[in-house]
Structures are given as structure tokens and as C-alpha cells.
């Protein structure tokens, strides 16, 4: 059954939801979007918070995980642990271009250490699979765990907004690290294993490192400090949208 995009009064909703609790926002999203509601996870450092929060209210929600093929061993093990414990309805998506084929065609893009190469990498390994997942699952709205304290771009986000063809809903937008820690502790939920090694954010093995004293924020530990966003949470330009449909991917 096709899910129809509902036209919402975003300015009013953004004001109403600005002071709502995470649970209230998730409940609102479930009631508003019904089977058209999905969530995404990276199985990162604090992933258990959103997974527990959302599945406590919407138990069988489709959980999209983009497997880049370059995740650390510990991330795959952490994903398996949380999937079993929380009984996740996990939907795994990958690029149709295998890591070996991508490297043969473009080289090790992350080693080129320029933004253009990193953007191409993210487009192939993350953005295209996510857009395909949202389309195949007929998503109207997408729950994600972005927080304002993570990057400069995220400071200006709203609890609900339109990105491309889907609404994006951010229940823990105003949470800080202390609130995350308290939630994990209260519900006996695990951090990613790399937390104990000084990581505050983890993605692919080649583009993540522990937090250093000179880092201004946690996302400086990603992408060699050249960029803060992988592209999943940025508005698509017309050119980016067109490239997602390219058979070259």
C-alpha cells in the first residue's frame, strides 16, 4: 500500500513541538504518519538511546541501517547485540557498488583527503542507499537522533521539517551528553565499545578517531576534520538528486 505525504503546517508544528518531550514527539509522529514512519540508526556510540526510545513506543518500526562495508568489527557486533535485545525490525541497505569495485574505479577515496572525494564516497556508500531505503519502504517520515550540540549545521534544525520527499522528526534534538548518559544508565543500555577508547562519534573505520584536546566538537573526529556531515542529513540539491538516479552508482 502506498503511503501519501501529508501536508503539515510546519511553522505551527515546529513551535508546538519545540518544548515537547522526546516521548511526546515520537508518539505524535506515530499517530500522524502511521505505517509511513521509519527510523534510521548508525549503531554509533549512543545509538541505543534512540533505538530504545522509539521501539518502546513503536515496537515494529522499520529501522534503516546503511552498511557501508567499511564499518569496524565492533560496530557489526554491537548492531547484532542491540538487534537481538530490542527485537529490531532491521532493514539493512548497501550500495550496489561493492567496496572492491568502488576502489578499483575511484581508488581509496577517503585517502585522497579532499572534500570532493569524501563527498563522492558518502554519495556512493551512504546517500544513495538511504534514498533507496526511504523510497522502497514508502517512508513519509523519518525519525533520527540528531542533536543540536553535535555540529554547527545541526544547531539550526527544527524538531520536524521537510527534507526531500520525507518529513524528518528529531525527538532528542535538545538533549545533551549528560541526558544521553542518564537515559542509558536508567535503562541499563550499552554504549558502543569504542566509547571506552575515547570515541564520541564513530562511523567507518578509516574516517573515525578518538576525541582530542584540540577538537572543537565531536564531529571534528570524523572525515579527517574536513567535513562534519556525511550527507544523509543535508538537503539535496537538484544535482545531487539527479546523481542518485545515475546507473553509475
From Swiss-Prot:
For this record, an example GO cellular component is: cytoplasm
Task: Enumerate the subcellular locations listed in this protein's record, separating them with semicolons.
Answer: Cytoplasm
Write out the catalytic residues in the record.
230 (nucleophile)
Cite the EC number: 1.8.4.8
Q: Does DNA repair show up as a keyword for this record?
A: no
Reactions catalysed, semicolon-separated, are: [thioredoxin]-disulfide + sulfite + adenosine 3',5'-bisphosphate + 2 H(+) = [thioredoxin]-dithiol + 3'-phosphoadenylyl sulfate
Q: Membrane-crossing residues?
A: none
Q: Which CDD domains match?
A: PAPS_reductase
Assigned keywords, A-Z:
Cytoplasm, Oxidoreductase
Q: Which GO terms describe its biological process?
A: hydrogen sulfide biosynthetic process; sulfate assimilation, phosphoadenylyl sulfate reduction by phosphoadenylyl-sulfate reductase (thioredoxin)
Supply the InterPro entries for this chain: PAPS/APS_Rdtase, PAPS_reduct_dom, PAPS_reductase_CysH, Rossmann-like_a/b/a_fold
GO terms for MF: phosphoadenylyl-sulfate reductase (thioredoxin) activity
The pathway this protein participates in, as annotated, is: Sulfur metabolism; hydrogen sulfide biosynthesis; sulfite from sulfate: step 3/3
Q: Which domain of life is it from?
A: Bacteria
Q: What is its main location?
A: cytoplasm
Is Oxidoreductase given among the entry's keywords?
Answer: yes
Entry function: Catalyzes the formation of sulfite from phosphoadenosine 5'-phosphosulfate (PAPS) using thioredoxin as an electron donor.
As for family, the record states: Belongs to the PAPS reductase family. CysH subfamily.
The molecule here is called: Phosphoadenosine 5'-phosphosulfate reductase
Q: Which organism is it from?
A: Synechocystis sp. (strain ATCC 27184 / PCC 6803 / Kazusa)
Amino acid at each position: 500500500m502506498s503511503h501519501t505525504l501529508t501536508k503539515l503546517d510546519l511553522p505551527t508544528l515546529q513551535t508546538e513541538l519545540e518544548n515537547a518531550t522526546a516521548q511526546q514527539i515520537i508518539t505524535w509522529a506515530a499517530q500522524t504518519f502511521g505505517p509511513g514512519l521509519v527510523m534510521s540508526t548508525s549503531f554509533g556510540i549512543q545509538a541505543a538511546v534512540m533505538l530504545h526510545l522509539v521501539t518502546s513506543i513503536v515496537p515494529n518500526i522499520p529501522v534503516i541501517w546503511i552498511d557501508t562495508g567499511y564499518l569496524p568489527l565492533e560496530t557489526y557486533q554491537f548492531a547484532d547485540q542491540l538487534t537481538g535485545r530490542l527485537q529490531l525490525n532491521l532493514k539493512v541497505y548497501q550500495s550496489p557498488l561493492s567496496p572492491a569495485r568502488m576502489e578499483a574505479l575511484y581508488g581509496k577515496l577517503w585517502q585522497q583527503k579532499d572534500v570532493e572525494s569524501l563527498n563522492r564516497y558518502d554519495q556512493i556508500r551512504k546517500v544513495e542507499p538511504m534514498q533507496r531505503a526511504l523510497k522502497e519502504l514508502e517512508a513519509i517520515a523519518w525519525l533520527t537522533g540528531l542533536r543540536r550540540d553535535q555540529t554547527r549545521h545541526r544547531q539550526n534544525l527544527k524538531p520536524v521539517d521537510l527534507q526531500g520527499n520525507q518529513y524528518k522528526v528529531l525527538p532528542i534534538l535538545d538533549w545533551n551528553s549528560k541526558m544521553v548518559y542518564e537515559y542509558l544508565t536508567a535503562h541499563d543500555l550499552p554504549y558502543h565499545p569504542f566509547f571506552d577508547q575515547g570515541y564520541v562519534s564513530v562511523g567507518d573505520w578509516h574516517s573515525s578517531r578518538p576525541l582530542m584536546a584540540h577538537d572543537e566538537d565531536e564531529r571534528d573526529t570524523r572525515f579527517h576534520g574536513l567535513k562534519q556531515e556525511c550527507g544523509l542529513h543535508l538537503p539535496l540539491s537538484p544535482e545531487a538528486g539527479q546523481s542518485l538516479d545515475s546507473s553509475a552508482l
